[in-house]
Amino acid sequence: MEESPLSRAPSRGGVNFLNVARTYIPNTKVECHYTLPPGTMPSASDWIGIFKVEAACVRDYHTFVWSSVPESTTDGSPIHTSVQFQASYLPKPGAQLYQFRYVNRQGQVCGQSPPFQFREPRPMDELVTLEEADGGSDILLVVPKATVLQNQLDESQQERNDLMQLKLQLEGQVTELRSRVQELERALATARQEHTELMEQYKGISRSHGEITEERDILSRQQGDHVARILELEDDIQTISEKVLTKEVELDRLRDTVKALTREQEKLLGQLKEVQADKEQSEAELQVAQQENHHLNLDLKEAKSWQEEQSAQAQRLKDKVAQMKDTLGQAQQRVAELEPLKEQLRGAQELAASSQQKATLLGEELASAAAARDRTIAELHRSRLEVAEVNGRLAELGLHLKEEKCQWSKERAGLLQSVEAEKDKILKLSAEILRLEKAVQEERTQNQVFKTELAREKDSSLVQLSESKRELTELRSALRVLQKEKEQLQEEKQELLEYMRKLEARLEKVADEKWNEDATTEDEEAAVGLSCPAALTDSEDESPEDMRLPPYGLCERGDPGSSPAGPREASPLVVISQPAPISPHLSGPAEDSSSDSEAEDEKSVLMAAVQSGGEEANLLLPELGSAFYDMASGFTVGTLSETSTGGPATPTWKECPICKERFPAESDKDALEDHMDGHFFFSTQDPFTFE
């Protein structure tokens, strides 16, 4: 902490010190409560010091403590905290004014408290005056401040307990609301999940419906293609059938032509065979003729010889050869005639071959056409089967589609209803959640208000508790002062008892001297009374015997044998009244000595203390003990006895000098002492009784 003049921070927005008392008791620790404004960041280097009011520098502190840094802070809210100053470091009591000052780590004063003093408590500070709440009476009650503070502390504690119970109830309600919100959120999540699953199912059904629709469209297109193909094939089949019919007609015509050509060829073949048979026969005949010619040549050769012989035969043969030549010519002519037939046959054969080839080609074309027709018919049959299958499948798909449409429409209606129900449920849940969130927000706000009030009440309770502790400390200090005063009174009591013992000794001495003097005077008067007894009767009331005290002592207990005339019970609440004057009974004769007058002075002092009935008697009579009681009661009893009997007699009862209550003479002395102790201030009971 560097030394620097006090730089006062502005009071607005600065540190605010709470419940600063005007006076503090020394030798007791002091608790300082303060509030940091919103936005202030507390630091461990900040400190709170006790300064004199006129201090102008931060180094002029009397003592200081480091500020406490809270663990958790809320942005935008003030910070309440406190520190304690130990009793050993506090200033000494006096009239000097002090104040708390908050100094930050830069050495700037951020706030200061009202001035206060350190001084010992005064006796009157312990009492406070209370007025009646209704104002119906003018009675003022004077009660100890500790009682009032204790009542206020009890009320604050009760209010704090009520607030804590209310806080616990609110926390329980908030917990229930949170659990309800969590259940609703879980239900909403489940509903959303179910809605998502239903939407996924709906999307799956939509996709399957789209796929089925696409497949149906594809099948419809395929069916259209197949129908178009079937129509094309039917047109092709019809065209091919027409072509086949045309080819069949042409083939039939060609067959007829082939048949005619075949018949003609057969005829030609028959003719050719006949011609060939004739040719072969002619050739055979030619060969036979050639052989015969050869034979003839041989025969000619033979016949040359035999020419002559056979010239005729040769002529014949020549004729026969000529005939044969004519036959051969005819055969050749016939062969020549057969050449056109051969050509015609060859042409017919070629035409038959070409017709056969054409028929073969037509047969092949017809076979290919038949195969194409069969193939087309088979393809048509297969197409018809496929179309039938496709139609069956389309019918099945149509039925399935209708069923799917029905089911889909039902599911869609159900899904729409469930979606609507879920939407309504979600809207209700959303409204419920909004309402619950609003209620939770209100509860949080109210809880925050309650927390703020509770914190404020806690701070005020802590401050009141601190004040109560301080008041209790003051009361303890006052109690110590009273104990010291009581010890002083005990010492004074001991001194008074010592003085009473001395006085008792002096009174015994004076009584003995007076008794001796009275005995001497009696003897002298008895001697004189023998001569004039009548004169004694006239002055009988004036004789010293009438005023002579009976034998007494400070520890006298009285003679037994008599019962009380009418004892009364002592009231616990007794008003001290002035007792009957005792001094007339104690007046002695005019011829008492100086010692007698001195004893009378001592007794007069004691009787005056009793007659005053004031605060001095209340304080002194209990300490005087049994000596004064015995003396006072002895005087009373003796005087009354002498008055009634005309001479000294044994007292039959004792009387309280304050309330005139009588006790038997044989009763214990402690009973009278306890009775008289009940009249005075210092007793075993509580000196104050408050309602």
UniProtKB/Swiss-Prot annotation:
Segments carrying the region annotation (C-terminal AD (CTNNB1 binding site)) are 501-691
Major site of localization recorded for this protein: cytoplasm
Q: Where is this region: Interaction with GATA1?
A: 45-125
Q: Which UniProt keywords apply?
A: Activator, Coiled coil, Cytoplasm, Metal-binding, Nucleus, Phosphoprotein, Transcription, Transcription regulation, Wnt signaling pathway, Zinc, Zinc-finger
Q: Which PROSITE patterns match?
A: ZF_UBZ1
Q: Sorted alphabetically, which Pfam families does this protein's record hold? A: CALCOCO1, SKICH, Zn-C2H2_12
* Example of a GO MF term: transcription coactivator activity
Keyword Repressor in the entry? The reply is no
A biological process (GO) of this protein is:
signal transduction
Instruction: Cite the residue spans of the region called p300 KIX-binding.
Output: 1-30
Q: Where does Zn(2+) bind?
A: 656, 659, 675, 679
Instruction: Establish whether keyword Heme is in the entry.
Output: no
Q: Where is this region: Disordered?
A: 514-606
Which ranges form a coiled coil? 145-205, 232-339, 417-514
InterPro entries from the xrefs?
CALCOCO1-like, CALCOCO1/2_Zn_UBZ1, SKICH, UBA_autophagy_assoc_protein
Q: Where are the zinc fingers (UBZ1-type)?
A: 653-679
Return the annotated region ranges for N-terminal AD (CTNNB1 binding site): 1-190
Modified residue annotations for Phosphoserine: 4
Q: Which family does it belong to?
A: Belongs to the CALCOCO family.
Written domain comment of the UniProt record? The C-terminal activation region (AD) is used for downstream signaling. Seems to be essential for coactivator function with nuclear receptors and with the aryl hydrocarbon receptor.
> How does this chain assemble?
Part of a calphoglin complex consisting of CALCOCO1, PPA1 and PGM. Interacts with the bHLH-PAS domains of GRIP1, AHR and ARNT. Interacts with CTNNB1 via both its N- and C-terminal regions. Interacts with EP300. Interacts with CCAR1 (via N-terminus) and GATA1.
The entry's function note states: Functions as a coactivator for aryl hydrocarbon and nuclear receptors (NR). Recruited to promoters through its contact with the N-terminal basic helix-loop-helix-Per-Arnt-Sim (PAS) domain of transcription factors or coactivators, such as NCOA2. During ER-activation acts synergistically in combination with other NCOA2-binding proteins, such as EP300, CREBBP and CARM1. Involved in the transcriptional activation of target genes in the Wnt/CTNNB1 pathway. Functions as a secondary coactivator in LEF1-mediated transcriptional activation via its interaction with CTNNB1. Seems to enhance inorganic pyrophosphatase thus activating phosphogluomutase (PMG). Probably functions as a component of the calphoglin complex, which is involved in linking cellular metabolism (phosphate and glucose metabolism) with other core functions including protein synthesis and degradation, calcium signaling and cell growth.
- Put simply, this protein is called Calcium-binding and coiled-coil domain-containing protein 1
Upper taxonomic lineage: Eukaryota, Metazoa, Chordata, Craniata, Vertebrata
Query: What gene is behind this protein?
Result: CALCOCO1
